[in-house]
């Protein structure tokens, strides 16, 4: 058995794999990743190494196509956001969160309906993540994860804006759950850094004060 074959065999979670051993394999250099999904593999490996190291996670390998890099990160954000959605189910129920809101001036309409409509926050969260998964896995817009057309890349901004609302609702209405999730994953910090780096959202829409400059600005406003 060659070393390459051994790597391909070991880097799988077989039937009956214990939780402690799940994905518990040695890291690979990006150049050694021969999978067609090497960018996803690289991103997930970097997150696993240290989820708090946002700068390293968002730094692409040399000569990496920017469109593919942005696309794969957004897919990964949506995957991880399911963890926050699961936590929110503890207390974010239609009876208490009848609308998808953040601060008092923000009420978000759900695009999953025939006509955009108000939705209970937990339903909005589910609909948004389902819609994002459908778009990002669409053969029409993303037939390849190796070469992505610019017209398809333009869709990423609308996905980013919608999924960010999940963070903002959790922060302003379920702060304890938000902090529990963020302290473990640093996902909102990574997402905010990502959309700022690639100009996928306007700064005034980034209302969760998660980055140092946002926190400083909030303190100045309060004073």
Curated annotation (Swiss-Prot):
It holds the Pfam family Mob1_phocein. It comes from Caenorhabditis elegans. It is found in: Cytoplasm, Perinuclear region; Membrane; Golgi apparatus, Golgi stack membrane. Keywords: Cytoplasm, Golgi apparatus, Membrane, Metal-binding, Transport, Zinc. Belongs to the MOB1/phocein family. Zn(2+) binds at residues 92, 97, 169, 174. May play a role in membrane trafficking, specifically in membrane budding reactions. GO terms for molecular function: metal ion binding. GO terms for cellular component: cytoplasm; Golgi cisterna membrane; perinuclear region of cytoplasm. It comes from the Eukaryota. Residues 1-23 are annotated as: Disordered. The lineage of its organism: Eukaryota, Metazoa, Ecdysozoa, Nematoda, Chromadorea. This is MOB-like protein phocein. It is a peripheral membrane protein. InterPro entries: MOB_kinase_act_fam, MOB_kinase_act_sf. Gene3D superfamilies: MOB kinase activator. The keyword Thylakoid does not apply.
